[in-house]
Amino acid sequence: AREALLAAQCPGRRRIAGEARQRFGAVHVLDPFEVSGHPSACYNPLDRLTPDSLDLGEDAASLTEALVMDPPGQVTEAHWNEEAKAILGGLIMFCVCHEDRDRRSLATVREYLTLPPEKLRALLELMQDSDAAGGLIARSANRFLGKADREAASVLSNAQRHTHFLDSPRIARCLARSDFAFADLRHRITSVFLVLPPNRMDAYSRWLRLLVSQALQDIARDAERPQSASEGRSERLKTPALFLLDEFAALGRLEAVERAMGLMAGYGLQLWPILQDMSQLKDLYGERAGTFIANAGVQQVFGVNDFETAKWLSQMMGQETAGFQTDSFKPGDGPSFSN
């Protein structure tokens, strides 16, 4: 219990765990639909992006990876998704570099994407004149405006589809400011709960993806940050932060999670993904599903009810010869034994 925690859980279990975790440190409940009975905390992913950072392009790209879900096996969507990421990244960087601080949010980026055609074109032409972010903003606008009208319309439609969840006033409010930093999970016993009711999971799973991805990015970057002479080793927790991903399948395929399974142990992070069966993992990660199994320190299995998972579990356990003895008795005869 004395470790930092990030949990994507259903409301009932969160309420029980959250009350217990308050004994150890700060508890932040991000609950846009207010099903936990407590006011929701907020986290704005754009708050950690700074206009003069050399990593601004990379940071914007990590956000677009979380926003744009690549369905497993749908190769035909790859081009449109990559182009959607490109224009989204440019709009995110423009927002960070040219908007007032109180306007720097994904809700503003969504506003850009849904502008009337003539106003959107004016915005893109303004981006072409920007020299911020090392010219990346201008390149993004040039890339989009250089497309034929039909292709550009398809790319824009795809970007709008992947950001549709940002139209929710509840989600926009929850992403408007930051009440904490995910890097806190490495420095003090902090608990973060991401709460979505089951009936909202399909529509708003990208919100979960976004926050889990940003948490992993922030922790990795904090771990790589050199400590100053005044900052002793005691400033960082000795026990790893636990990511309890109860709704793992709802996240979709997320490269940040895949990387974390192999690398995050060195960053003071422990992932605990929870799945209904092995098919969910294979559907999401294909041949890379083995990465999760190979890097797992412990595997827990309960109530196996499907053949594929039972077969996998049997193969993992291997074979062993078991010896046993049976006793039998018949009236009028002595006992008999067999091995």
Predicted ranges, named:
Residues A1-L269, L284, R288, S336:
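P-loop NTPase motor domains
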Residues E34-S36, M278, D306:
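Residue-level detector of flexible, active-site-proximal loop/helix-junction positions
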Residues L67, H79-K85, A183, E258-G262, ...:
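P-loop NTPase motor core of the ASCE superfamily
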Residues L275:
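H-loop/switch region of ABC-family ATPase nucleotide-binding domains
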